[in-house]
């Protein structure tokens, strides 16, 4: 892929996100989306810089200060990158809950923490999932 977008989740995971991104091919244009302002424990753009992500990816605030990624609340710059990235890696259950209805291909990486989500999708509570969503369908990997 020439363009990859990683949607960050928890502040504490940003260090591990950097380690993951360091293994992407160097020719790849990598964008790391973070919150524009503090929300619960989600990583902000400033915290992403503190974690060193700016050394391996272009950090882009998503333009919203709400849980998950609600595209109608995000900045036009974020939307442009979201729509043109060849690969989108979405971390965290909140991002899954707000993006799983989108029609584009998205890879979701998260731990199932909510009994309602577990029951509705028939996941086990506490399961770690890597899901590929393409053309409106989810597939477990």
Task: Give, region by region, the residue ranges found by the protein language model.
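Conserved nucleotide-cofactor-binding alpha/beta core module
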Residues: 1-3, 14, 21-64
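Well-ordered, non-transmembrane segments within structured domains
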Residues: 4-5, 14-15, 19, 110-111, ...
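Short beta-strand/turn micro-motifs composed of small residues
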Residues: 8, 34, 110
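Gly/Ser/Thr-rich loops at beta-strand to alpha-helix junctions
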Residues: 9-18, 37-39, 93-97
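Structural motif
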Residues: 3-5, 86-87
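C-terminal functional extensions of proteins
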Residues: 40, 47-141
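Active-site glycine-rich loop that binds ribose-phosphate moieties when present
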Residues: 12-19, 23, 70-74
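Short, contiguous strand/loop micro-motifs
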Residues: 7-8, 65
């Amino acid at each position: 892929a020439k363009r990859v977008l990683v949607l960050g989740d928890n502040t504490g995971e940003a260090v591990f996100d950097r380690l993951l991104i360091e293994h992407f091919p160097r020719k790849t244009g990598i964008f790391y989306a973070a919150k524009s302002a503090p929300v619960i424990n989600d990583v902000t753009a400033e915290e992403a810089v503190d974690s060193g992500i700016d050394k391996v990816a272009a950090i882009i605030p998503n333009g919203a200060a709400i849980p998950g990624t609600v595209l109608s609340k995000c900045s036009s710059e974020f939307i442009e990158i979201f729509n043109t990235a060849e690969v989108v890696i979405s971390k965290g259950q909140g991002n899954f809950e707000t993006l799983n209805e989108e029609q584009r291909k998205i890879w979701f990486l998260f731990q199932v923490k909510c009994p309602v989500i577990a029951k509705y999708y028939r996941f086990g509570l506490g399961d770690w999932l890597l899901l590929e969503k393409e053309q409106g369908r989810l597939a477990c990997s």
